Amino acid sequence: MGNNEEYFIDVNDLSIDVFDVVEQGGAVTALTADHGMPEVGASTNCFCYICCSCSSN
């Protein structure tokens, strides 16, 4: 195998997008889902982690 750069593609050049995948029944997951700082509620829907009783569960 030669240079790895020959295998890189630009995702903008792909002929399908996330909406096409979903319409065809495919599952789409965000790479950032559930990543954050649970100790301060960053992965919750709580907007005021200091004053509310939201949990990260």
Curated annotation (Swiss-Prot):
Q: Which Pfam families match?
A: Thiopep_pre (PF19409)
Where is it mostly found? secreted
Record-given protein name = Thiocillin GE37468
Q: Which organism is it from?
A: Streptomyces sp
Covalent cross-link (Thiazoline-4-carboxylic acid (Phe-Cys)), residues: F47-C48
Q: Does the keyword Cell division apply?
A: no
Give the source lineage, highest ranks first: Bacteria, Bacillati, Actinomycetota, Actinomycetes, Kitasatosporales
Per the record, the covalent cross-link Thiazole-4-carboxylic acid (Asn-Cys) lies at N45-C46
Compartments in which it is found:
Secreted
